[in-house]
Amino acid sequence: MFDIGFSELVLIFIVGLVVLGPQRLPIAIKTVMGWIRTIRGLAANVQNELAQELKLQELQESIKKAEKLNLTTLSPELSKTVEELKQSAQKMQSDLDAAKGEITKLTDEQVANIQNNIAQEEQNLATVQPETLQKSEENQPLVDTANAEENPSLSPAEIAEQAELDESQFAAYYPPDDDLASPTPSQPQDKQNVS
């Protein structure tokens, strides 16, 4: 690479020994060898990249020539590989089309099933009479109809107010607050440490 002979290496070694001394010479040699390795690696990478670029250019030129000749004068091996590639591409396309058809068929079936289920639920809800839905306990109005019949002079707002005051309905949703309202004297307070 540098075209250095054995005698020139010995001369460089003696000069390095005199200048650097025996302690620093091995470290300097290791450093120089590391630089040489790095330079050789870079040169090899550049050579490989140039070779790949040349191959790529040759391939592109051969493709252009083949396009100009319309693939009629290609060698039998190249025409055979081109036909194989076309067949494999057609096979892959047909497989994809078949898979697409199956998927669309399955999704159409599932959509039809869901629509049938929705229609059946709508029919079931239509057959259930609204009066029976209103009679369930959750759907009962808050207004007490018995109390409204006893006092017909009360307005609906007053009837609703009385219904809110009814503890039997109120206790169904909330626990009684009596236990929390009064403080328990069971815990004696220590007032001696307050200053």
From Swiss-Prot:
GO biological process: protein transport by the Tat complex
Keyword annotations from UniProtKB, A to Z: Cell inner membrane, Cell membrane, Membrane, Protein transport, Translocation, Transmembrane, Transmembrane helix, Transport
Subcellular location as annotated: Cell inner membrane
GO molecular function terms listed in the Swiss-Prot or TrEMBL record: protein transmembrane transporter activity
Membrane-spanning segments: 1-21
Biased composition (Polar residues): 183-195
KW Ion transport (keyword) present: no
Cellular component, GO, one term: TAT protein transport complex
Family classification: Belongs to the TatB family.
Main function: Part of the twin-arginine translocation (Tat) system that transports large folded proteins containing a characteristic twin-arginine motif in their signal peptide across membranes. Together with TatC, TatB is part of a receptor directly interacting with Tat signal peptides. TatB may form an oligomeric binding site that transiently accommodates folded Tat precursor proteins before their translocation.
Subunit structure as annotated in this protein's UniProt entry: The Tat system comprises two distinct complexes: a TatABC complex, containing multiple copies of TatA, TatB and TatC subunits, and a separate TatA complex, containing only TatA subunits. Substrates initially bind to the TatABC complex, which probably triggers association of the separate TatA complex to form the active translocon.
Alphabetical list of HAMAP family matching this protein: TatB
Name the record gives this protein: Sec-independent protein translocase protein TatB
Organism for this UniProt entry: Actinobacillus pleuropneumoniae serotype 5b (strain L20)
Gene: tatB
